[in-house]
Amino acid sequence: LLELKVIADVGLVGFPNVGKSTFLSRVTNAQPKIANYHFTTLSPNLGVVDTENGGFVIADIPGLIEGASEGVGLGHEFLRHIERTRVIIHIVDAASTEGRDPIDDIYKINKELEAYNPEIASRPQVIAANKIDCIFTEDGEESPIDKLKKEFEPKGIQVYAISAVSGQGVRELLFHVKELLDNCKQEPIVFEQEFFPEDMLMSENLPYTVE
């Protein structure tokens, strides 16, 4: 089996149900399955983004969970898809609609990326702080967007407040992603031969012992 090493320019990563499929359907003509259930996406959905400065291919990577680098929740399959992209869009639920901390989520996902392959964690990232239409803050309370910017922009990771449902903030995010791609080293597309040890064992005349 010959396998395409690079499947997309950009990979969407994040925990399940943060809006990756909705984002993909917003920015491309792709029609991924969208539902309010974890693991709705079980294989990458690809779409083409067109901007004034050119287009790029984007892949909705199935939602990651803690332990993915150890194979939990089909983790190795999911991480292998991310390995084949050049820029990462990290989508988080900025409104914490499921009670999750978006800052904590980003660190957890990046920890899984680094554990699987440190080179992936070093690739250009941008944070899409999604579901801003669902954010409600008390008077004097710091907004989750400001918290994300304060945490990650000093590290060189830009944060864009977006709504995948309404499209707010999406255009600016896409232009930044295109700039990141333009500044990336273009890696050649490589075909690899898949290796399955069990096939090798079956094809060889190995000695056996009956006890």
Which residue ranges define each predicted feature?
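Conserved active-site and cofactor/substrate-binding residues in soluble primary-metabolism enzymes
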Residues: 73, 104, 168
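Glycine- and Gly-Pro-enriched alpha-helical subdomains that act as flexible
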Residues: 94, 100-107
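Short amphipathic alpha-helical/adjacent loop interface patches that line ligand
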Residues: 46, 82, 106, 113, ...
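Charged helix-capping and loop-helix junction motifs
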Residues: 72-74, 107-108, 143-146
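Conserved G1/Walker A P-loop phosphate-binding module
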Residues: 1-72, 76-88, 92, 174-178
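C-terminal-of-GTPase-core extension/linker across diverse P-loop GTPases
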Residues: 1, 5, 12-13, 18, ...
